[in-house]
Structure formats: structure tokens, C-alpha cells
């Protein structure tokens, strides 16, 4: 009974294509990040701007943009093990519409003798005649028709009348699929490595790289080279294939086919081969010293490159001036240029050179995943995604000169032009020295932040490490942050995940009496600060430029509550509105006019030169400042229909959404002033100054429908006053590129966001991008709106961003990055009563204890606000050393420091168990890569390195944790120590060895000028042991060290020596271990995991239960729910399993067999899990006699940058949410036609779990909050009569489970 939620969306870009999908006006970039599909466009400066984004239910393995005669392509999306969705952009609803859905995975499993792979591939035929899906030795061909011109269609229909009848019958854009094993194409095809369509042929042709007899370097001398390449011509109508040619005896390291204009390149780890479209091997390039020299063709020796092209290979191919230009990127993001030039069938140029990039732009990037763009000799623009490092949009500045230079180099390599020799009859090996390449300049135009792969997590103080900021309490006091190790190689870094926004405090003030503040700017400078205290009915003025001294103004209404005040009249007048009147002053507060009212003013909007008042009776008044002398306000005539309407809120907005209904402005895009009002029956109405008694309304807003549109207002026959809309703002949100949004704040604290359609300014579409739930209807979440009133404030320039603040007990900020959707974050960890703009790009905020802080948006350390939590990157830099990969992190609570382990790559040193060089070791040969590890002590105040310890060569730290170790068995005294588990990486024929280290962190005298360097590592104990150390774990005041397959518990003595006290043997190899009190779970690499108990009197480890399934365990963690013990286990197949210790169940054999509850598909590899406390948003849970039972939840990380949480649920909550999830899946239209239930639960373990109690998906459940009110009520009624409010409470409790990080308990 748990729910899964992604608290950080995936950041690794795994697919990208360019083309026209949503508009024909500009080329678009379409990318996927696991299950996130984004459409972006490029501005004039090359920055990426998000146009649309959708979160899909499954992982996307491939993308292809299919041409269509409408001009807008259809997007083919490959998910699962072989599911293709063909979708188009629905401009009316701003969403994806599925045109065709094809499930091949079941057929693949039927045809395949082996388990179908989890990473299928999607290919489009160059002439867009068909799509090819292949997974292992199975393939499916899907004919396409949507791109064909009318003449082509008629010709094909004459030749194939059956096809014409089938097309006319269903009107589909695709034909009938053909699914077959690869051996159907040719009987010899087996163990397919790659399959691609070839270019430059009249008919569809496919190249297949396969290895009928598997071979590797260990048996290569016996099997020889068994790789084969075959070119087949396909007849899509008759489902036949014809062999064009077959090549045998190719190197076993080949893995990728790269189609070119008149041939293809076969890329391998050690060589590149060029094969023309007739199947003739015309040339080869050796890339390193391990390349195959026995090929029957001309070989160009480029072994000095020492390049290794591992799979998967990232490449970009284009054509210029009759030459094929191929850009390759290896695992370390080094770029290589391959030029292929031919005269007819005669290959004249085939050369590979490494491009010397002068600005080291890819220094922090590794493992490219996708590349797309456009490139010609004048300019080149590419988008490159990386597994490690930010995705980058780059410009190749001096491409033309670089390619011209490389052309000269390739010509010097031509020594023989004999035709037969080039075709391999008398091939010879040719060796030439390469000329030096000219510097290659690449300019980064924009980046998409990537924090993957995330390898380790720790929870500790980062933003709250300082108790005071600017002499006031830290606005992020008591907050804990999640700090993760991210990335590989030089680009590895720490990522800080903040649950709230961490502002930069510039100045602080202390007030005695204030409930609301205003900043009056005179001539562009902050001049006056006006405050009011409604409890004491008093207002004051302070002179800002005189260090906030009180300003004496005799005419100012001090003994009254100020509702609003602002500068008007072009900066020459100041207006003060109190609860009983309006007062007009000059800029020195000399009175010019006063208007007194016999009603109470409750809301005011001042927008030069207009003044809008809303009174307590629901009436409005609008005044305009007399334009000539600006000495009085003139009443504006209102439409007659307003007399029949009860108004709850009024505001003056600027927008062009009503222009098409206004005479003379039908084609204008200029924004107009709109007097906007919210009625008691939750309608939003507008009118202009010259209204002619014409009022407009926003249809559908009363039910918060998905689409809103403008129309002429018609007074309803019956008005049922039930106000729920509190405030309305139409504003432009963003950074460099701002977009117009409609923001609605309700009395229940809910925030709804609608985006204005670009093509139809009179229409708005609801944003359903997993926005943070801030409130609930029916008073289901009173905590959110009690105490301090929630008020929305639009800030046009908040350190460059246009944002919306919402004050209250829990304040929020709505912010949008240019390349992301809008996000809602809690703002700091304090209550905000009032706020006002300040300076150029800051705000002044007043909290509930009268403290005022001037704050601006924190943009330090690559801080990013485009994901579901605030992210910041910390690069650990040392001028003398590159730490490379950071792989583990832990937090030392006593000293409030973080410890990070690193593993840097070195040349492998072949040493024996006695640390002597192995017999036959030759230091002059090319080395394999080894590791050398160490640990770093960091201060979160400055993230500077305090202390460092480096271990010997071949060392690799697999795990380290801080633990409370018992020092004395009599006094039970404990101390926090650091335990480090280290393994020595050696040859496979040498027994594994390791070591563990015990450290204390002690306080020392800091270095001069470096107050943070006041802690150092203190060595307590260390020991070399037999067996590799893969994990360490605390257990009941002792610590467990894994030694290959043995778990050894050790105890520390009073003299700081360490002795083993208990052990347990596991079947194969220990991968992970976690403890909870005196209970422990230990995961095995092949045989699942065991549930153990530890007893100290006498010392022993008791096996309480084992998993029945033989899981290939990756990570394990406890999940405790209301006294019940559950286990979370992830395996190598990207599955998360939930098991339970239930000795009372009859099939558990008194608990010896752990009960399998459910299995849940993860879309990426899990790397780490941690148990943390759960926040109970609606009160603490007690269990008998008033005993408080703390709640827990699990957080985890994945290789694609995702951070997730698993939250346990009560029985009642699970039942109602399960019903809602079923309704959402069955009743709502799913993107790309994907079934969320199938994408998450379809796996081999489905039948083993409780089918009616699967793990819930919060991504699906959260859609409930974005539904229209009638749809929500209908769904909630299925769960019970009073279930609507309970469902909202359950959603909020899950949403705010991580708020436990904001509280020190």
C-alpha cells in the first residue's frame, strides 16, 4: 500500500530530432528525457525556448518525425519493448492526439527464442515509405502513406488495387504491419547487432550487421572473425527481400551501421569500415593499436589516434559539396571528423581525424546519447545530449576552414587509384603521418541542465547552516537539503536539492508595528516606504534614502488603515486609499484632493491613471486621474449590467485577449487595459474604458475547465453566490522569453495556471504540468489558508525573472525558466505577511514577527528552477588535482559537514596480492584503465575542501557512511564515526581484497583567513581484509562490513581496536545492506535478499526471512508503515519490488518466506535508496495509549537523473486513491495511447504480487487536481459520499511528505 512519485523529473536527454511538428513557421527541436517529451524552438541567439511539454506514461526509446503533406510531421514514438505511437499535434487542445497505435512486443516475445531486450530501436526509411522497429532478432515494418503526393498515391493504387481498397476502407495514414524474425529476411541472420535503412537506392534497402556465431577476444583465435554484414532490398508490398551482397569475416568489435549518401560506415571499437551500396568493402581506418589488420581492403593507419568507439556511438552525418561529412563522438565527448569522397564508385577520400576543440567546451561532458541539427559549410548548429553533463546547443564557428584543411590532408594520402585494388583484390596497408589540425571553435549557445547519473544521496544542512543572515534569523532556518553525487569523469559534481527557494538576503530591518508595506518609487528610485498596521489602525512613512528615518507628512492619513498606496500621474502624484476614502498628494505628500466614502473599501487596484475600488457590499467604483492638471479623480461610467452583479474582486490588467471583439483592434496584438472582475458566482468579466455597455466573460472558469475562451457576457437567469475565486492575475512569466499566463488563486488556497494560446489570444489552456498542490476546496486543507491571508503579487523583475509571489503562512513563488514549464515552489521557511517591490530586481518581505528582509533570487552555482525542486550544482575544484567521478556522499551531523568519496581514472597497475608487479607485466604497453580513490571533507558554508585522504592505486570506495558507534558496552555511550569500505580492483585471476577505515572528525585550529577549515579527519582504525567490500552498514551500535559473500559484524573496543562478533554467509555476492534498529536486510547479486535480526547477548545474526524470487538485487531499503515491516528492492531489470514480513500469513511459513506484494517498473536504473522521516501534514499518527509512531518514506535516485520517493499509505487512503487511479486511467485520454497501468505493472512478477494492491503512481493521481470541478466530483463520488475532501487530503499528504526536511525533529 504505497505510492510512487518522481520528485525530480529525468534530466538525461536520450532522444532528439528536428523538424516541424507544432508549427511550420520555424524549425523545432523535439527531445525526450526518459518519459518527458519536450518541444523547443531556438531564438535568434540560439537559446532554447520551451513551446510544449508532456509527461508520458512510458519510457521513450526512439523518436522519428514522419513527413506529412499538411506540412506538420507526425511523430512516431517508440516505447516499451516494441510499441509505436504515431501522434499529431492538436492545436485546438494544445495536446497530442494519437492517430495510430501499434503493439509489437507480444509478437516479438512469441517469435524470439530468447528474452526480448528492453531497448528496441526505431528507424525511418529515407524516403519515408515505412518505419522499422527491431528488437534483437525480431523486426516489424510499418508502411507509411501520409507523406505521399496525389500523383504517387494514384500510381501506387493502380499497381496495388488491394492496397487502395484497404486505404479507402479505414482512411489510415499507415498500412498493415509486418512482424517477422530477422531470419525471414535471410536464413543466416542471427544475433543482430544493428539494422539500418540505407540511402541512395531506388527501393527500400536495409543493412544488417549480425554475428551468427558469438565470439569474443577470449576465443577469437578459435572462432576467428564471425561478424557479417548483409544488404537486402525490401519489397514492402509483397513482403519479400533480395540479397544485394554479403560481407563475411568482419571484425567482431563492429556494432553500428551509419548510413551515408552512397554507402555506409560500419563503426566498431577499433576500426571504421566503408561499404558502398553494392556491398563492396572499399576501405578501412584503424583507430588504435588493437585494430584488425587482416581485412581484405586498403587500410589507413590512424592508430595514433588511440580512439575507441564504444557502443552506443553518437554520430551526425551530412553532405556538402558532394562529400559525406561524418561527426563522431566517443565516450569522453571527444569529437572526430570523417570525410568520405567518391567519384562514381571509386572511393577517393576516407579519413578520420580528431578535432582539436580550443575552448574545451565538452570538458564536463561524457557519454553522448543523441545528436541532431543542421550543418553546412557556412554555419553549423547541433544539439547534443549527454548521459553525464548538460545537454548543449552548440554552433560550429570555423567549420568551413576546418573542413577545407582536412580535404588537403586527405588528398596527400592517395597513392594508388587502381580500381581493382580499391575493391580488395590486391589490398595493401598504407601508413602516413597525419598533419596537425587547425583549432576548431565550438560556441555553446544554450544548455539543458542534467544531473544524471545520480549515484548517491545524503540528507543534511546546506542552506540552513548559518543561523543568522543579515543579523536576522535565516529565512531557511531548520531546513535540510538533499545532496547528491552526480555525473561521471571531470564533469562530476554535487547537486543540492532544496525543498524551498533559498533567497539571497541583501538587507534586513526590524519593525514594531506593521501588517502591510508599499514602496513608492520617485523618478525611478526608492523614495518612501509606507507601512500600515490594521490592528492598531495606523499608517507611517519612512524615507528610504535617509536610512529609513520617519518622514513627517502633515497631510498623510496616519490614524487610518491604508488599503493601498502608489505613485500615479506619470510619477508626479501619490494616492493613498484608506478604508474610508481616497487622498491625492504630490510627491512631497502635500494634499491635493480627498474623497470620503460611506462604505468600507476592501480591495484596491491602482494602475496609472486609473483607480479601481471594491467595497464590502460587492460594488465597484472606477476613477481616472484628470489628465491635464492631475489634481483630482474623475468617476468613470460603468456598464449597466454591473449593477446586477455582485463583485468579489477587481483588478486592472493588460492583455490583447479581447482585441478580436473590439472594433478597430481585430488584427492588433497590442495589449489593452481591461477592467477585470470576479463575480460571486465565479465568473470573470472584462470591459474596456470605451466599453459601450459591452462586457466580455471568460467561459468555463467557474468549473475550471481545461479550455477557456472569451465571449460576450450574458447575465444568467439565476445567480447562486458561492465565491471560490479570490484573485486573478494575467501576467507574463519567464526569464529572457516571457509568455502570458492566467493565474487564479482561490479561497481554499488552490492555484490554477492557464497559458494563453499563441495563435488564438482569446483562448487559454490549463497547465497540468504537475504543479505543486497549494490548497484544496471544501476547506479540506485549512492549514494552508489560516493565520495569514494569501495574496498574490506580480513582480515583473525579480533578478531577471518575471514571477508571482503568494504571501501567507506558507508563501509560494511561481517561476518559469525559458526551457521549462512554470513551477510553484515554497518560498523560504518563514511566514510572509506582506511584500513590495524593491530596487531594480528585489523584493522586501515582512514576516509574522515584524522582520523585514530585502531579498533577491539566488542564481549562484548554476541554480535552476525548471524542475520540480530547486537545483544547484557544486563543482569541487582543486588547482592541483582533478577528482573526476564523485561516487558516494554522507553527512556528519555532529560537525555539520559532508564527506564525499571520489574515484579518478589512472593507468591500471598490475600488482599481485603482495603488491608486486605481475609476471609478464610490461609498462610500455597500452594500459587498461584503473581507479584511485579518496575521501574529501567539505564545509557546506562555502563548499570548500577542508581535508582530504587519498588511498593507493587500484583502490575503489564502494560505500561509506557515518554511524553512531557504541564505544562502551557498559555505559552505552556512542559517537559518530565515518566508516569507509574500500576494494582493490585487480585482475580476474587474483582473489579479491579490500579494506575498511574508521575515522573520527575532530575540531582543530582553522587556517588563517579560512574559518571553515576547523575540522580534520582522525584515523581511528583500519584493516585489510580478504574479499571485496561492496557495502557498509550500522547495526545496533556496531557496523557490518561485506566481504564478497560474507557479512561480518564488528564491534569497537575501548582501546579503539575493532573485533568481529558475528557473521553470515550469503549465496553469491553482497550488493547492498540496510538496517532499522536491530533489524537488517542484505541483498545478494543473484539470489534476492535476506531479512535478519541481530542480537548482542550473545552476539548472533538470525535469519528471519528470505525472498523467494531470485532477484538480481541492486539496492534495498526498509519501508516501515504503522508498525508493519515492508522492504523495497530494486533489481538489474529496472524493477522495484515490495515485499513484506508477515509471519501470520499461512503461505509465509511463519515469516520465513517474505510475501511478495507488488513489482513496479522503473524507467531507469536505480542507484541508491535512503529511508527518511515522512511529514504528516494532517497531524501525527498515534497508535495506542497516545504513543507517537513516526512515519517514514524512502527516497531514491536513478541513472537518468530522476529522484523519486515511495510513500506508505493507510488502508483507507489506499482504497480511495486506488479507485481514483483506476478512474483516471479508464476515463481520461492517455497521451500516445499508452496505458499507465501496463507501463508500470507489466513484468514477469505481476502474478506473484497482490493484483488488486499494486503500487500507485502519483503522476497519474495528481491529474485529479487538474480536472474540472464536475469531473472531479463525479470521480470522487465513486469512492464514497464524502470522499471528495478526503481525496484532497490524501493528495496533499503525499505532496508534502518531504516537508519533513523543513523541520528539525
UniProtKB/Swiss-Prot annotation:
Composition-biased stretches (Acidic residues): 149-159
Disordered, as annotated region: 147-166
UniProt superkingdom: Eukaryota
MF GO annotations: RNA binding
GO biological process: mRNA processing; termination of RNA polymerase II transcription
Position of the signal peptide: none
Keyword Nucleus: yes
Entry keywords, A to Z: mRNA processing, Nucleus, RNA-binding
Pfam families on file: Beta-prop_RSE1_1st, Beta-prop_RSE1_2nd, CPSF_A
Family per record: Belongs to the CFT1 family.
Its job: RNA-binding component of the cleavage and polyadenylation factor (CPF) complex, which plays a key role in polyadenylation-dependent pre-mRNA 3'-end formation and cooperates with cleavage factors including the CFIA complex and NAB4/CFIB. Involved in poly(A) site recognition. May be involved in coupling transcription termination and mRNA 3'-end formation.
Descriptive protein name: Protein CFT1
Gene name tied to this protein: CFT1
